[in-house]
C-alpha cells in the first residue's frame, strides 16, 4: 500500500481535523482502544495505522506501520533508514525513541535503530 503525505495537512485521503466518522468512511472498520493509560480519548486501529483524535473526535494524528510505504514529495520516507529520512525531512532530529520534526509534526518510532512506525500530526502536535 502506497500512502502520499502532506505534513500537517493530510495522510492519504485523511485530512487532519476530519471527524471520526469521516475517517472511518474513508478507511473502513476500526477497532477502538486506549493506546496509553492516561489517554482521554480512544484511538482507532485500522490494522496498517492508528488514528488519534482530540476531545472533539477530530483527527489529530495518524501512526503508520511497516505494512505501508509512505511518500512525502515523491520520496519514500518509510520504511527506510535514518539517513534517507533525514535527507527527505531536513529538520528531523534524534530523540530517545527515534527521529522527530517539531515543525512538521512528524515522529519516527525506532527504539532500536530500525523504523517501526511513523506518525504524522496536525500543526503543533508535538508542541502540545
What are these regions (language model features)?
Residues 1-41, 46, 56-128:
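Non-cytosolic coordination micro-motifs
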Amino acid at each position: 500500500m502506497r500512502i502520499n503525505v502532506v505534513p500537517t495537512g493530510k495522510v492519504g485521503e485523511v485530512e487532519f481535523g476530519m471527524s471520526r466518522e469521516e475517517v472511518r468512511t474513508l478507511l473502513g472498520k476500526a477497532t477502538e482502544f486506549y493506546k496509553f493509560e492516561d489517554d482521554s480519548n480512544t484511538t482507532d486501529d485500522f490494522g496498517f495505522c492508528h488514528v488519534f483524535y482530540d476531545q472533539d473526535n477530530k483527527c489529530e494524528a495518524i501512526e503508520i506501520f511497516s505494512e505501508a510505504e509512505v511518500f512525502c514529495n515523491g520520496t519514500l520516507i518509510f520504511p527506510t533508514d535514518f539517513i534517507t529520512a533525514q535527507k527527505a525531512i531536513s529538520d528531523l532530529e534524534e530523540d530517545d525513541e527515534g527521529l522527530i520534526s517539531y515543525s512538521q509534526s512528524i515522529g519516527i518510532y525506532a527504539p532500536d535503530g530500525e523504523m517501526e512506525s511513523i506518525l504524522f500530526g496536525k500543526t503543533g502536535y508535538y508542541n502540545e
